[in-house]
């Protein structure tokens, strides 16, 4: 096991057919966001203490936490249906755009200026 630089990590993610997110505890879901931004269809554990489960667009993107059989069945389905997997990846790519850093910062600035009544700085 090793750490990857960002460019290396993107290459690793893009080389995968699916992205599996088995975390039982997570708040930010950054790894999942990176994977879907790279065009990977995610399989996400439905762990009750993981916010990432809320990124599942369909039931096929969720598997029962700590249930390797359910995970294997979901993986097999996605691997046996490449057209559906690609369509799902495209939906996720569009979905991930709302979490783009620059877009989020623009929204945060808009929220703060609306709340304070200040004028928005437009470069």
Spans of model-derived segments:
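Conserved acidic donor-binding segment of nucleotide-sugar-dependent glycosyltransferases
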Residues: 57-68, 77-82
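Short alpha-helical segment that forms part of, or immediately flanks, the ligand-binding pocket
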Residues: 10, 28, 33-37, 51-53
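A charged, aromatic-enriched C-terminal amphipathic alpha-helix characteristic of glycosyltransferases
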Residues: 80-113
């Amino acid at each position: 096991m090793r750490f990857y630089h960002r460019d290396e990590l993107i290459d690793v993610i893009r080389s995968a057919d699916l992205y599996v997110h088995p975390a039982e505890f997570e708040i930010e879901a950054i790894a999942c966001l990176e994977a879907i931004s790279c065009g990977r269809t995610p399989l996400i554990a439905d762990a009750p203490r993981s916010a990432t489960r809320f990124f599942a667009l369909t039931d096929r993107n969720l598997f029962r936490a700590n249930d390797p059989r359910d995970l294997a069945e979901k993986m097999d389905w996605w691997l046996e249906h490449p057209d559906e997997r690609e369509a799902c990846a495209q939906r996720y790519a569009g979905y991930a755009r709302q979490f783009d850093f620059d877009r989020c910062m623009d929204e945060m600035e808009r929220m703060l200026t609306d709340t304070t009544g200040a004028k928005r700085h437009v470069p």
